[in-house]
Amino acid sequence: MRLLVTALTTVLLAACTAIEPAPQAPQAQPLVPMPLNPAMTEIFDGKALRVILCGTSSPLPDPGRAKACTIVVVGDKAYVIDTGPESWEQLQRMQFPGSRIAGVFITHFHSDHIGDLGEFRMQTMVAGRRQMLPVHGPRGVANLVTGFNLAYEEDARLRLAHHGESVIDLASSPLIAKEFGKAFVGGLDAEEIILRDGDLTVTAFEVDHDPIRPAVGYRFDWKGRSVVISGDTGLSANFTANAKGADVLVTESLAPNLIGMAQQQMNAAGNLRAAKIMADIPDYHISPLDAAKTANEAGVKLLVYTHHIPSAQVNLPPYFAGVAAIRPANTWVIGWDGLRVDLPAGSTDVQQGELLPKPN
């Protein structure tokens, strides 16, 4: 598949000298321990509601980004929203403590949102998780959890045989399904409080990803601060209503102009299957401009774009055409894997930082 913009960089190698030196025996290099990330202590201090992006791409290839994944940190617990392929690797790059993950929330069952669920099962167990990992989701989550448990149960037994019970707790290794949304029947008007934990309330709400049903977003409210994660969605009144007054809205972005160009190129190349997909996807993903309009209507403080389609071109000027005209520059950000947003308790501040460097 040809990318929309192809950057060809020619590197000229210096000519070898006529006489090459004799090869040297390789020198042993000492192992240098990786320094601990001090941010991993700070983010669990209980002073703020925190958001971390751990996957910001889509099924279209982008080597610098994992597929869909967002983390919300509350107190000493972390909650993962979607577990797209490569997302666990990004958490490892951040040195994120897997034992702090207290639950997973699935927005819908496309592969780019669930592909690393098995890795989360295994890696959090190895990191020290000592209770079954809840996986919250709408109708269908039980089948998802059953499948990943079956696929990974032998892995857990093999690791127990090798490392012993001091490392592997076989009884707590499985995922456990937490299904909700009996009223989520595609009317795009339903919401449900699915978790209360101290000062934290998590609400699931229907979104329009038709024909994908059910599909949901999540709202996290804690001590007067709030974060909304839309999942994959188009415009809907229910989406806007549940984003009302949020400090942060994390939502996807599909650039219809660039996807249209991709469709034309694929048709011209005779790749009709890929062209058909490019023609189909704009009708169930929100554009950057429509996301900005939704954020404005809902009174959102910071709009964070993620799940970029196509993510390899996200920094091209046409991608966010029109957004700057309706939303000030300091109220929206192009998300990357490692973006961190802090919402301190008892404050209205919205603070941005990074756990991984922003790509060029």
Model-derived segments and their meaning:
Residues 12-15:
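C-terminal motif of bacterial Sec signal peptides marking the signal peptidase cleavage site
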Residues 1-7:
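Sec-dependent signal peptide recognition
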Residues 19-20, 216-217, 223-228, 234-338:
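Cap/insert and terminal regions of metallo-dependent hydrolase folds
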Residues 17-227, 314-349, 354-359:
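Binuclear metal-dependent hydrolase catalytic cores
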